[in-house]
């Protein structure tokens, strides 16, 4: 009788352990949630384009004026903005209204900015075409600036193609870039922000989105493609 009892106990223990093991295997894990083919295939309906496709779309067209935003479009300039915030207003964005910050940012701090690879490709393409290149930024204007030289040097822009940076500034309720796009008769404008795309649309020209890097200090990140605009693939760097 004792042997039978021990045998039954062993069977029960084995069943319990096996059930526990199966439960561990089959229970969903919050640490490793997994995925499926449907989720992997899901994509936002965005009009993606490459630099090569943009160049091809311009085949046969004469040289034109094209424009670029600066911050997060051609330069990853977060290091300067990060330093500005820590120096002038650690607990707020008030540093963006401080002329002392803009004097620093526009006169040397872009030496810490990283040129974006997508900008190199685009600017090289437009230089080959003989296009006139403008940079229109929302930065505040300062008495002096070295941004124009920094951009010309970083992207090897010939003097014949390069124009001085336009500091459009920032005015509440107003898209300050519109008048410059119109005045310089730009036909394409590249930018990372919604304001860049809407400025181009307000002027009836082609606005092309460049992705803002995920680690940019400029948050929140915009919804690229939200206006049905072209968005350049792999343009976050």
Swiss-Prot record:
Enzyme Commission number(s): 3.1.3.2
Names of the cofactor(s): Mg(2+)
Amino-acid positions noted as binding Mg(2+) in the UniProt annotation, renumbered to this chain: 69, 71, 192
Entry note: cofactor: Binds 1 Mg(2+) ion per subunit.
Family matches, as CDD domains: HAD_CBAP (cd07499)
Protein keywords: Hydrolase, Magnesium, Metal-binding, Periplasm, Signal
One annotated GO molecular function: metal ion binding
Compartment(s): Periplasm
Residues engaged in binding substrate: 137-138, 177
Reaction equations catalysed: a phosphate monoester + H2O = an alcohol + phosphate
Active site: 69 (nucleophile), 71 (proton donor)
Domain of life: Bacteria
Cysteines joined through disulfide linkages: none
Major localisation: periplasm
InterPro entries, A to Z: Acid_phosphat_B-like, HAD-like_sf, HAD-SF_ppase_IIIB_AphA, HAD_sf
Signal peptide range: 1-23
Pfam families assigned to the protein according to its UniProt record, in alphabetical order: Acid_phosphat_B (PF03767)
Subunit structure comment from the entry: Homotetramer.
Family according to the record: Belongs to the class B bacterial acid phosphatase family.
Function: Dephosphorylates several organic phosphate monoesters including monophosphate nucleotides (NMPs), coenzyme A (CoA), nicotinamide adenine dinucleotide phosphate (NADP), flavin mononucleotide (FMN) and phosphorylated 5-6 carbon sugars in vitro. Also has a phosphotransferase activity catalyzing the transfer of low-energy phosphate groups from organic phosphate monoesters to free hydroxyl groups of various organic compounds.
Name listed for the protein in its UniProt record: Class B acid phosphatase
Organism: Salmonella typhi
Gene symbol of the encoding locus: aphA
């Amino acid at each position: 009788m004792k042997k039978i009892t021990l045998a039954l106990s062993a069977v029960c223990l084995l069943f319990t352990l096996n059930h526990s093991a199966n439960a561990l295997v089959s229970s969903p894990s919050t640490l490793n949630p997994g995925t499926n083919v449907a989720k992997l295939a899901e994509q936002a309906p965005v009009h993606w384009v490459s630099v090569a496709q943009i160049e091809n779309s311009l085949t046969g067209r004469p040289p034109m004026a094209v424009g670029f935003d600066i911050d997060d479009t051609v330069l990853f300039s977060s290091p300067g903005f990060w330093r500005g915030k820590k120096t002038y207003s650690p607990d707020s964005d008030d540093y963006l209204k401080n002329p002392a910050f803009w004097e620093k940012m526009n006169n040397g701090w872009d030496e810490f900015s990283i040129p974006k690879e997508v900008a190199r490709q685009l600017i090289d393409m437009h230089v080959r075409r003989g296009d006139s290149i403008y940079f229109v930024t929302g930065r505040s204007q300062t008495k002096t600036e070295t941004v124009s030289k920094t951009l010309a040097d970083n992207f090897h822009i010939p003097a014949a193609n390069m124009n001085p940076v336009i500091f459009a500034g920032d005015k509440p309720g107003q898209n300050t870039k519109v008048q410059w796009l119109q005045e310089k008769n730009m036909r394409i404008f590249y930018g990372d922000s919604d304001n860049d795309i809407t400025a181009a649309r307000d002027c009836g020209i082609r606005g092309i989105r460049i992705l803002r890097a995920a680690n940019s200090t400029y948050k929140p990140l915009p919804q690229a493609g939200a206006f049905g605009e072209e968005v350049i693939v792999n343009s976050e760097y």
